[in-house]
Regions:
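Conserved pre-ATP/AMP-binding loop-to-beta segment of ANL
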Residues: 38, 53-56, 177, 182, ...
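Structural core segment of the AMP-binding/adenylate-forming
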Residues: 1-11, 121-193, 629-634
Length: 635
């Protein structure tokens, strides 16, 4: 008889507690390949469905309203519809190596599309909030053959973006429209019409999906240059669900409040695949997930209604929930709060522990590790600020690397270095081989680009991002400790520190804060607060700038490039002020550049032709001391 863990052949009726490192090492004596019961994500969802066929797989809310009756899809119906979707894509010509991209909000058929695409070919979830040119770059880099997208609908511009990018997609054979009538003569098909024509009890292709087969391409990285596409195998993704269900003791019938995007591995794998493969249920808060203001506003009533064990999201959402008093809501079902995607500020973690009386399970990983790689093991003491220990069969090292990314040595306990990781979740490389330069250390250890340390007990502490360092006159300043100090100010809701250009030092630290609703600060108050609490004088921000809102990515991380561009604009505008004082119309805009990373564009307007070259020369002289590239444009 099968044990409690749907994805493990050997675990019996009780999960192991794994309370010590010795217990984990003993558990690992059995090879992982002998344990795992699913070779593909399709298998994993099927095994979860067998545990709870008539239970809810998805409970869909239209507007995060706990009083609404959700649309319920059972596990039996979900795996049937995934099978139909795979057959639909096969009928449209998709084979094992073909890419099915999708741009969808969190509607039920988005989840069906993700796993149907992986069963038919290769799924490629795309952030529909990106600009059309970025979407086109991703779809072309992936060689997209089929695109699934939301049809025309008020309040969303997804279809308009599809129409804009379609002419640029050389490999595209078909578009499938969710909530649309389609236009078959023009290669646009209605999802609802096509899927119902397909059998739900078998894969028509007869495909036997191997663990080594590519399951998905996830886009990652910044906003410039060729998009990085991370290749996940089915085995990579199944490991995520296997390990998290093991450590969090997944069981059929549990509910998870879900609002993460599917183009982020924290949503599609950490939460969705893990939940479905255990026979548990996703309570989908709305098509826009946590972005719907009702999701946070109604959070405690939603907890009372659906009784989840975990409050799980990105740190920005966790911080926002703290501003909503639970009142009389019964939130006793909650056993822990979990967050990842970026570091949970210690101030936020402490507030969760104090106000909600919940332990904080911080997780760490990246798209390249198929999401979570380390976490705070339940049952062991929580070390607030640490991201815990590697999951079973995974490993972490802290190392010193040379300028070419080659290994110099391993760091000692408590010594800060670069975090590198290996294990069953670690990807095999980016789709574009040019992106693999420097991605791995000794071929199997992925270079995270993060700085961290291991304490004496092997707990991982992330101390910063190598590229987030502020380098002041050759002195490396880690922004994380300064951000923590800013967070502790009672008026500060969110904080970030970046480098602003400086002609002498190269960079100087500058702080940005988003104040809590209704909060006010006096001029100089935040600067004084940080100065008094920062032992390292060079690390004190030269200025702390309140902004609203703080720029964030689609998954709630602070988008630091935007802050760096803003800081540079402020500096260069000040440097060019003498030209403005002479009546010259001079405007500075800093943004991304494909080759240089960032560039300052100085626009000179209304100059007589005989003065243009001379004034442009003055701009070049004034900006020459700065490292950032610049260009002058005449308007």
């Amino acid at each position: 008889m099968a044990g409690i863990h749907a994805l493990d052949r050997l675990i019996g009726n009780d999960y192991p507690d794994l309370l010590t490192d010795e217990e984990v090492r003993a558990f690992e004596q059995v090879p992982y390949a002998d344990r795992v019961a699913a070779e593909s994500t399709y298998d994993a969802i099927r095994l979860g469905a067998e545990r709870n066929p008539d239970g809810a797989a998805v409970q869909f809310l239209q507007n995060a309203d706990p009083a609404d009756t959700p649309l319920v899809i059972t596990h039996r119906d979900f795996i049937a519809r995934v099978t139909q979707a795979a057959n639909m894509f096969h009928a449209l010509g998709a084979e094992k190596g073909d890419v099915i991209s999708f741009m969808l909000p969190l509607v039920p058929d988005a989840f069906v599309t993700l796993f149907g695409a992986e069963a038919a070919g290769i799924a490629n979830p795309v952030n529909p909030l990106l600009e059309p040119h970025q979407i086109a770059e991703i779809l072309e880099a992936a060689n997209t053959k089929i695109l699934v997208a939301l049809g025309p609908m008020p309040g969303t511009d997804i279809w308009q973006k599809v129409e804009q990018v379609r002419p640029q997609l050389k490999h595209l054979k078909a578009i499938v429209q969710v909530f649309g009538g389609g236009d078959p003569a023009n290669g646009v098909f209605a999802f609802g019409d096509l899927i119902k024509q397909q059998p739900s009890d078998r894969l028509v292709s007869g495909r036997k999906i191997r663990g080594s087969d590519i399951a998905a391409y996830f886009h990652t990285g910044g906003t410039t240059g060729t998009p990085k596409l991370v290749r996940h195998t089915h085995a990579n993704q199944v490991y995520q669900a296997w390990a998290l269900n093991l450590l969090l003791k997944g069981k059929p019938g549990a509910n998870l409040l879900f609002g993460m995007p599917l183009f982020h591995v924290g949503g599609s794998l950490t939460q969705v695949l893990t939940t479905l493969s255990s026979g548990s249920s996703l309570v989908v808060l709305s098509p826009s997930g946590w972005r719907n203001p009702n999701a946070v506003k109604n959070i405690w009533q939603l907890v009372e209604r659906f009784k989840p064990e975990a409050l799980s999201s990105v740190p920005t959402v966790l911080a926002a929930t703290l501003a909503v008093p639970p009142g009389n809501a019964d939130i006793s079902s909650l056993k822990y709060a979990a967050g990842g995607g970026s570091a949970i500020p210690v101030a936020v973690g402490s507030a969760i522990q104090e106000k909600l009386k919940l332990p904080v399970v911080e997780v760490y990983g990246m798209t390249e590790t198929s999401s979570v790689h380390t976490l705070a093991y339940p049952g062991r003491p929580i070390r607030l600020g640490s991201v815990g220990l590697p999951m079973p069969y995974s490993r972490v090292r802290i190392v010193q690397l040379d300028a070419d990314g080659r290994l110099i040595r391993d760091c000692k306990p408590e010594e800060i270095g670069v975090v590198i990781m290996a294990g069953p979740g670690v990807f095999g490389g980016y789709l574009n081989d040019e992106h693999n330069k420097g991605a791995f250390v000794d071929e199997v250890w992925v270079n995270s680009g993060d700085l961290g340390r291991l304490d004496a007990d092997g707990y991982l502490w992330i101390t910063g991002r190598a590229k987030d360092l502020v380098i002041r006159g050759g002195h490396n300043i880690d922004p994380a400790p300064i951000e923590e100090i800013m967070f502790r100010h009672p008026a500060v809701g969110f904080a970030a520190v970046v480098g602003q250009p400086d002609a002498y030092a190269g960079e100087l630290p500058v702080g940005y804060v988003q104040l809590k609703p209704g909060a006010k600060v006096e001029p100089g108050e935040l600067e004084a607060w940080v100065r008094e609490r920062t032992p390292e004088r060079a690390a004190v921000p030269v200025q702390v700038i309140p902004i609203n809102p703080m720029p964030v990515t689609g998954v709630g991380k602070v988008f630091k490039p935007q802050l760096r561009w803003d800081a540079a604009e402020r500096v260069f505008t000040k440097v060019l002020a003498p030209l403005v004082e002479r009546g010259i119309d001079c405007n500075v805009k800093v943004g991304p550049h494909g080759s240089h990373g960032s560039i300052a564009t100085v626009t000179l307007a209304g100059l007589p032709p005989d003065q243009r070259e001379a004034i442009a020369g003055e701009v070049h002289v004034l900006l020459a001391p700065f490292v950032m590239r610049h260009e002058v444009v005449q308007a």
